[in-house]
C-alpha cells in the first residue's frame, strides 16, 4: 500500500505548527517541549520509512544541541552562544510566521480578484486549499508520534519477532470499524493502548488514515493537545 503523508513546507513550518498550539507569544513557549514534539515527529517518520528531506534532519540536530544545553546542570554561567542559538531559532520561527501570514493574505486577495474577473484560479490557490484540508490528518499524525514516543520503552523490551505480513491494514480497518460499531467513538490513545509491537501500532495508524481517506471514519480534536477522537461517519 502506497502511503503519502501531506508534508509541511519545511522544518520551520512544522515548528510554527507546534508553537502555534500554545497560543502564546513565540518567545514564551516551552522550547524543550516543542523540541521533543519535533523530534518525536521525525523519529516516527523514520520508523515508518517515509521519505524525509535533509533539511528536517539538519534542524533536528540543531534542536538536539539546544535541548541538551537546556537540560545540562547549570554548573557554570550560561554560555553566550547558548542563548544566541535559542533566540536565533525563535526569531526564525517568528519571521516565518509573518512571511506565511503575508503569503496567505496575498493568496486570499488573488482569490477575490479571480472571482471578480471570472478568471480561472491559479494552481497556488488550489494547492493552499489542499493544505488546509489535510491539517486534521496532520494533527492525527503528530498525536500518533507523541503516543509512539511514550510507548518506545515498552516496545524496546519486547523482543518477539513479528513478520511484516502478520499485521495487515485491511484487517486493522475491520477491527477499527467493529470497535466503532460497539463504542460509537474511540480515542487514538485507546486504540493503541494494547499494542505490544511497533508494527502493530503502525499498521493500526495506517488503517485509521485509510478509513479517514475513504470518509468512513471522522476525527475530532476539541482542543490543542487534546485527545484525538475517531467516530464512524454517517453515510
Curated annotation (Swiss-Prot):
Subcellular localization(s) per the UniProt record = Cytoplasm
Highest classification ranks of the organism: Bacteria, Bacillati, Bacillota, Bacilli, Lactobacillales
Q: Which family does it belong to?
A: Belongs to the ScpA family.
Q: What is the name of the protein in this document?
A: Segregation and condensation protein A
Example GO biological process: DNA replication
Q: Which GO terms describe its cellular component?
A: cytoplasm
Q: What does it do?
A: Participates in chromosomal partition during cell division. May act via the formation of a condensin-like complex containing Smc and ScpB that pull DNA away from mid-cell into both cell halves.
Q: Write down the Pfam families for this protein, in alphabetical order.
A: SMC_ScpA
Q: Which organism is it from?
A: Streptococcus equi subsp. zooepidemicus (strain H70)
Q: Which UniProt keywords apply?
A: Cell cycle, Cell division, Chromosome partition, Cytoplasm
Amino acid at each position: 500500500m502506497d502511503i503519502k503523508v501531506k508534508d509541511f513546507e519545511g522544518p520551520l513550518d512544522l515548528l510554527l505548527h507546534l508553537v502555534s498550539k500554545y497560543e502564546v507569544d513565540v518567545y514564551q513557549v516551552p522550547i524543550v517541549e516543542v523540541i521533543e514534539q519535533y523530534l518525536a515527529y521525525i523519529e516516527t517518520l523514520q520508523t515508518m520509512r517515509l521519505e524525509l528531506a535533509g533539511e528536517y534532519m539538519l534542524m533536528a540536530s540543531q534542536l538536539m544541541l539546544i535541548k541538551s544545553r537546556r537540560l545540562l546542570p547549570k554548573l557554570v554561567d550560561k554560555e553566550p552562544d547558548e542563548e544566541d542559538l535559542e533566540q536565533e531559532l525563535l526569531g526564525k520561527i517568528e519571521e516565518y510566521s509573518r512571511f506565511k501570514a503575508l503569503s496567505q493574505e496575498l493568496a486570499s486577495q488573488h482569490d477575490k480578484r479571480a472571482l471578480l474577473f471570472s478568471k480561472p484560479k491559479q494552481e497556488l490557490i488550489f494547492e493552499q486549499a489542499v493544505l488546509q484540508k489535510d491539517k486534521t490528518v496532520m494533527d492525527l499524525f503528530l498525536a500518533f508520534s507523541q503516543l509512539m514516543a511514550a510507548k518506545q520503552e515498552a516496545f524496546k523490551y519486547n523482543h518477539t519477532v513479528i513478520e511484516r505480513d502478520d499485521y495487515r491494514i485491511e484487517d486493522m480497518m475491520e477491527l477499527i470499524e467493529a470497535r466503532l460499531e460497539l463504542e460509537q467513538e474511540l480515542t487514538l490513545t485507546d486504540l493503541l493502548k494494547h499494542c505490544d509491537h511497533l508494527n502493530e501500532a503502525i499498521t493500526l495508524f495506517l488503517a485509521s488514515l485509510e478509513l479517514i481517506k475513504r470518509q468512513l471514519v471522522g476525527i475530532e480534536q476539541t482542543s490543542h493537545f487534546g485527545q484525538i477522537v475517531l467516530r464512524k461517519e454517517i453515510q
